[in-house]
């Protein structure tokens, strides 16, 4: 039984899920965040209010914050870094959300490895011991945090899955996704991404095709139907801390 199941119900809070979004085409991702907030709401105790916004959509963050009191901010990001450590706090301050409380981002939530393992195992068509897992992730040319969180996820998945090999591959840094896919040859590709944006729809399939990797590319983990419940659990836990 999870720790949050032992805790008394948290007092009603306001909350906001925030993602980076897509600056070139912000509207679709903005809609996804609002839908995610709506899907999370039923998992929260009565009285909670939750909204979603992206940083990329002009005015969206300010509009989402309007009327919220001391909201919990849920960063829908896969790692700590510039966006969670610098840009998001700055944008919150500029919006006047001085009482907002930012919590751990999605990619570092302790329950995420179990979901990743369950999703990957459900996609296997052979014994796990003969199956490879390729974790497709963003990476960064300037920061180690994205890679570090991906390697930590790979390490957490090893005992949970029993896969033959688990390799991370990155879009923006070495070891690049195509190289890791080529090294594995076959298996399952699970994108360690929050949203289904350009890297997921274009870069990952291109790298897999270039490598001749045999196996399915699963939807990004952030789009799994169980994610709203994970977000709600994280918010409830943060409110009761």
Question: Where would I find each of the regions flagged by the language model?
Answer:
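Active-site-proximal alpha-helix that buttresses catalytic centers in soluble enzyme cores
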Residues: 1-241
